[in-house]
A protein has these predicted regions:
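Electrostatic cytochrome c docking/interface patches
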Residues: 21-42
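The canonical Cys-X-X-Cys-His
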Residues: 41-51, 121
Length: 129
């Protein structure tokens, strides 16, 4: 009886292991990267808003916790002024889903359909004290 002894280099063993597990790794989706709230704000909001100055829409610094319709120097719609809304993450989320549905008669019409994008924008705004 003849026995054969196979000797493999460490590099060959590492390569074989990597190839053996490659299909397992390929089947796993990488976790999604966190969305960049600042970039989404710039893309979706900055045409009409800024953090520190009123534009077409009111400034946003300090929006979380503020009552709607109170930024000095901005001409709010009567509907938004009378709404009594306090901007929380929850009310901002509802607002961004459809401002006119939340406050009929408001000036704002732009929506953010994607819930993850809304959450990222709201998270960004919450940090802008």
């Amino acid at each position: 009886m003849i026995r054969t002894l196979l000797v493999f280099s460490p590099a060959a063993v590492s390569l074989a292991a990597a190839l053996a597990f490659a299909p397992v790794q390929a089947g796993r989706a990488a976790p999604p990267a966190p969305l960049d709230g600042a970039a989404l704000y710039a893309k979706n909001c900055a045409r009409c808003h800024s953090l520190d100055a009123n534009k077409i829409g009111p400034k946003h610094r300090g929006v979380v916790g503020r009552r709607a319709g109170l930024v000095p120097g901005y001409a709010y719609s009567p509907a938004l002024k009378a709404s009594g809304i306090v901007w929380t993450p929850q009310t901002l989320d509802r607002w961004l889903q459809g401002p006119s549905a939340m406050v009929p008669g408001t000036k704002m019409f732009f929506k953010v359909a994607d819930p993850a994008q809304r959450a990222a924008i709201i998270g960004y705004l919450a940090k802008q004290k």
